[in-house]
Amino acid sequence: MDTIYALASARGKAGVAVLRLSGPRSHEAVQAFGVLLPPLRHAALRRLTWNDEVLDEALVLLFGAGASFTGETSAELHLHGSPAAVSSVLRVLSGLPGLRAAEAGEFTRRALENGRLDLAQVEGLADLIDAETEAQRRQAMRVFSGAIGERAERWRADLIRAAALLEATIDFADEDVPVDVTPEVLTLIDGLLADLRREVDGSRIAERIRDGFEVAIVGAPNAGKSTLLNALARREAAITSEIAGTTRDVIEVRMDLDGLPVTFLDTAGLRDTSDLVESLGIERAVTRAKAADLRVFLLDDSGPLPGITVQADDLVVQGKADLRPGHGLRLSGRTGEGVPELVAAIGERLLGRTAGAGSLTRERHRLAIERAIGAMESVRAELLRGQQHTELAADDLRRAIRSLDSLVGRVDVESLLGEIFASFCIGK
């Protein structure tokens, strides 16, 4: 296997730059700089030289196979963060035999292949790197720390137990095996179904935390929507004008709201119009508003809005509070009156929804669980039809196990046989 190397820290001038190496020749590559290798997992300051020239002074860290991020023999060089110093060391590494520059994500790929991370943890690491808000960071850390894998291992153990019971009645019918294992299998299946359904119920909120919530600002033309967006963004994100219908397309502004990733949508003013371009903008506004996680209706005296109605979960705000009296939640994007209260109300609504977030943060996770649920529902139906359908139920159980493979890895035949032998003392 090749030994790979790459700059692990950000490119450009910095206090420290970290070079990472992984593979059988990583320690040998460090030694090529004329340094005395330190003990494993001990940082040591070493002078890196090449052709009698000092390239840099670096902290050197060595890791043994099985005790590194990738699971391979690895090394790290902590250099001064000079682009020239980094380039000089990379140039030497590129000329050493058996070494090559790493491809994108290759260190993490090796960690996956060597069992240091499961696939969900790899995805959690990617989400952690991309996290922009506190909620995203916390969620990504849970996944990276193995929350999905731990749950999946418990589900997997129950599935294997249920499969072992059914396979035993099929393959060892003449042996000392309980005649009817249906009640025990149904108990396992019912417990699993309850757990998995809870996870699916919470998955869409978890996906929203990862991808971000959308909050649409809806109202009639010239109601102050763009002015409100600018007040929320604290910059001129949208053009404002006294001319009704200025906003034709959806304008998006992404913000960190109480630790949640939120994209505010400034939509075209809703009204009946014969203007083709404006009508297209209104159609798009209605579509985006209906799909948004939360809608803020900015109302004035223009009456009902065409194409959309206020729902129970929507926020209704009286706009242009600086120009007209009123009661309830009122604001003025121009003066800032009521904006903090609106932000607090939006944050409260969205934070309330995150309480039900599960561990499944991606559509892939949810679809795998939904396939497993479908297979287990088939198992349940077959078992309730009678023992003559045990083989069909066993096949559905294997399908459920395969559906979870993307989360926990493959279930091999030996583990299934081991469970059978341990449970039913089959071995004569």
Curated annotation (Swiss-Prot):
(6S)-5-formyl-5,6,7,8-tetrahydrofolate binds at R20, E76, R116, K428. Coiled coil: none annotated. Its cofactor is K(+). GTP binds at residues 222-227, 241-247, 266-269. K(+) binds at N222, S241, I243, T246. Mg(2+) binds at S226, T247. Its main location: cytoplasm. Keywords: Cytoplasm, GTP-binding, Hydrolase, Magnesium, Metal-binding, Nucleotide-binding, Potassium, tRNA processing. One of its GO terms (molecular function) is GTP binding. Exhibits a very high intrinsic GTPase hydrolysis rate. Involved in the addition of a carboxymethylaminomethyl (cmnm) group at the wobble position (U34) of certain tRNAs, forming tRNA-cmnm(5)s(2)U34. HAMAP family: GTPase_MnmE (MF_00379). Homodimer. Heterotetramer of two MnmE and two MnmG subunits. This is tRNA modification GTPase MnmE. It comes from Cereibacter sphaeroides (strain ATCC 17029 / ATH 2.4.9).
